[in-house]
Curated annotation (Swiss-Prot):
The gene is fabH. CDD domains: KAS_III. It comes from Solibacter usitatus (strain Ellin6076). It catalyses: malonyl-[ACP] + acetyl-CoA + H(+) = 3-oxobutanoyl-[ACP] + CO2 + CoA. The lineage of its organism: Bacteria, Pseudomonadati, Acidobacteriota, Terriglobia, Bryobacterales. One of its GO terms (molecular function) is 3-oxoacyl-[acyl-carrier-protein] synthase activity. It comes from the Bacteria. GO terms for biological process: fatty acid biosynthetic process; secondary metabolite biosynthetic process. It is found in: Cytoplasm. The keyword Transferase applies. Catalyzes the condensation reaction of fatty acid synthesis by the addition to an acyl acceptor of two carbons from malonyl-ACP. Catalyzes the first condensation reaction which initiates fatty acid synthesis and may therefore play a role in governing the total rate of fatty acid production. Possesses both acetoacetyl-ACP synthase and acetyl transacylase activities. Its substrate specificity determines the biosynthesis of branched-chain and/or straight-chain of fatty acids. This is Beta-ketoacyl-[acyl-carrier-protein] synthase III. The last Arg residue of the ACP-binding site is essential for the weak association between ACP/AcpP and FabH. Residues 257-261 are annotated as: ACP-binding. Pathway: Lipid metabolism; fatty acid biosynthesis.
């Protein structure tokens, strides 16, 4: 069976930066309040003319450039997002056309903040099945389009950004790098605690839904915090145990960047040293499907992630969706 490895990485964030001081002018909040509760200092915001596909295209091109391959070599595109350009056609189709990935197939994957992690796992299994040689997994979200900037509880949390990873087959059997295992679960009983109430078939767009601001993110923060910090710890613990690894074996844990307090709580319960937990939420906020590739890029640039390291990705998102995966880093 072929091995699946991550062979390239590309990211994109819009140039505009929205600071906590900027938010002080919009809602009743301040830098200290935001930093203490979230760990976020600033976030990037897409220009009005920029959509999710535009950021995804930039990230995809960066990944292809890093790998030095043509888009025609891509077999499949998995586009992870909760903010597609349209309900249909899929954003994956728009990206495929723009980058010239002729012959590729693909789809959009909606799993909120766990989306990119689920996409990585799906892509890895396509490769390991022997049916695909190269799968491009992209996480891209323009969360600013579904955020209520009169709600201080949510508007401080989110930013816009995108990242792409190329997964490909490798015959380097003795290299030891690549995908190891994944563990995930969903729990629909928590769906009401983090959601966008309208815009789907349950509550299609109407004057009423717009007037009631139902097309924005609604969150019950305390419920999400308790669940996320507990489940992130549990899924990481169980995945390590299943593969006979100790916490000390992990070179770097790269968690979804939702809230610094959630990450710290999960890491403390897991017993992993803080210096082996990647946190970059201060600069980007929660970019939903973009957080894992953005955090991975920064880890590499800071010299915290090197070839051969055991990497533990973890995420908890709306739904609820939960997951963790282990990889031996390949570059």
């Amino acid at each position: 069976m072929p091995k699946a490895k991550i062979s390239a990485l590309g990211c994109y964030t819009p140039p505009r930066v929205l600071t906590n001081q900027d938010l002080e002018k919009l809602v009743d909040t301040n830098d200290q309040w935001i930093m203490e509760r979230t760990g976020i200092r600033e976030r990037h915001i897409a220009a009005p003319e920029m959509a999710t596909s535009d950021m995804a295209i930039e990230a995809a091109r960066c990944a292809l450039l890093q790998r030095g391959i043509d888009a025609c070599e891509i077999d499949a595109i998995i586009l992870c997002t909760v903010t597609p350009d349209h309900l249909f056609p899929s954003t994956a189709c728009l990206v495929q056309n723009a980058i010239g990935a002729k012959g590729a197939w693909g789809f959009d994957l909606i799993a909120a903040c766990s989306g990119f992690l689920y996409g990585l796992t799906t892509g890895a299994h396509f490769v390991m099945a022997g049916t695909h040689k190269k799968v491009l997994v992209i996480g891209s979200d323009t969360m600013s389009r579904i955020i209520d900037y009169t709600d201080r509880a949510t508007c401080v949390l989110f930013g816009d950004g995108a990242g792409a990873m190329l997964i490909e087959a490798t015959d380097e059997a003795d290299d030891g790098t690549g995908f190891i295992d994944f563990l995930g679960e969903i729990d629909g009983s928590g769906g009401e605690f983090l959601r966008m109430p309208a815009g789907g078939s349950r509550r299609p767009a109407s004057h009423e839904t717009v007037d009631q601001r139902m097309h924005y993110v609604h969150q019950e923060g305390s419920q999400v915090f308790k669940y996320a910090s507990r489940k992130m710890y549990e899924v990481c613990r169980d995945l390590l145990e299943r593969n006979h690894f100790k916490v000390e074996d992990v070179g770097l844990m790269i968690p979804h960047q939702a809230n610094k307090r959630i990450i710290k709580a999960a890491g403390d319960r897991l017993g992993i040293a803080p210096e082996r937990v990647m946190i970059n939420i201060e600069r980007y906020g929660n970019t939903t499907a973009g957080t894992l590739p953005l955090a991975t890029r920064d880890a590499i640039s800071e010299g915290r992630l090197k070839k051969g390291d055991l990497v533990l990705f973890a995420a908890v998102g709306a739904g609820y969706t939960v997951g963790a995966s282990l990889w031996r880093w390949a570059f």
